[in-house]
Regions:
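N-terminal Rossmann-fold cofactor-binding loop
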Residues: 59-63
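Active-site Tyr-X1-5-Lys
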Residues: 149-179
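Alpha-helical substrate-binding/gating segment
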Residues: 200-208, 216-250
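N-terminal export signals
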Residues: 3-25
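Conserved Rossmann-fold cofactor-binding substructure of NAD(P)-dependent oxidoreductases
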Residues: 76-91
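NAD(P)-dependent short-chain dehydrogenase/reductase
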Residues: 172-218
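NAD(P)-cofactor binding segment of oxidoreductase domains
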Residues: 89-146, 164-166
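N-terminal Rossmann NAD(P)H-binding glycine-rich loop of SDR-like oxidoreductase domains
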Residues: 35-52
Length: 252
């Protein structure tokens, strides 16, 4: 995907947030399947897609925040082979918010291949390595997927497993796929406190012991902006990979 096209998508997504979604008033109403949907990112994806009038179905284990969306169709299953609830159904777009292990992603991808129009996979900026350099673009080298027997998600395996999941989706769907690589996602519902801690601590004043220097670039994306972009991807179905983060620069 050319950078100009990516900027156009991000600009339109930002406009959605700014004007309450009215920019998409004339867009086609889609049947969207969200794999996951009840963690940190998912509820924001649901809100953004509902604002566009799209018909949503969730597929998850029913363990995280059960009953959060009683007004939505929720199919209960498991990515590790318990996919019967998805059989015989069709959707326009799938948003994969719960893919971490290539083998499991392959199972879902194969099952849905002939029953959907487009697959959007939520990956991570971590595929580039632990400390990505400034100015990365979507064609830069990513981590090497681990041996197929490695399925435990840890700090050491996360990047490679996510990169392996990307390979599965791109090889299965080709131009019918979108890979979104968010940087650190922040905003309402984030339980990690990995970003907000520093903002609050600095606001309190006094000396702060912190890693790095004040000149280090800082990259993140507000979960609501990410959700608006995901909606745009669902509606436009662009092929390719996208880094989802703030514009370049340092924050002080």
């Amino acid at each position: 995907m050319k950078r100009r096209e990516a900027i156009q998508l991000f600009t339109a997504a930002a406009a959605t947030t700014a004007i309450g979604g009215r920019v998409f008033a004339q867009s086609q109403k889609l049947r969207v399947l969200i794999l996951g949907g009840t963690g940190f990112l998912g509820p924001h994806f649901v809100e953004a897609l509902q604002a566009g009038g799209h018909q949503l179905t969730l597929f998850n284990r029913g363990k995280s925040n059960p009953g959060l969306f009683n007004n939505l169709e929720t199919l209960i299953g498991d990515r590790d082979g318990k996919l019967d609830a998805l059989k015989g159904r069709e959707w326009d777009v799938v948003i994969d918010d719960s893919g971490y292990v290539p083998r499991q992603v392959q199972l879902t991808a194969d099952l849905l291949k002939d029953h959907i129009r487009h697959y959007i996979f939520v990956s991570s900026i971590s595929v580039y390595g632990t400390f990505p350099k400034p100015g990365l673009n979507e064609d830069d080298k990513v981590a090497t997927p681990p041996d197929a027997k490695v399925e435990e998600v840890t700090g050491e395996t996360y990047a490679g497993l996510k990169a392996g999941c990307e390979q599965v989706i791109e090889s299965t769907y080709g131009a019918r796929s979108t890979i979104v690589r968010p940087h650190y996602v922040v905003g309402p519902g984030d339980s990690t406190d990995r970003f907000t801690y520093w903002v609050v601590r600095v606001a309190r004043g006094g000396q702060v012991l912190a890693p790095g220097s004040a000149n280090d670039p800082l990259k993140y994306i507000d979960v609501r902006d990410l959700a608006a972009f995901m909606r745009r991807c669902a509606e436009q179905r662009p092929a390719g990979r996208f880094n989802a983060c703030t514009p370049p620069g340092a924050h002080t």
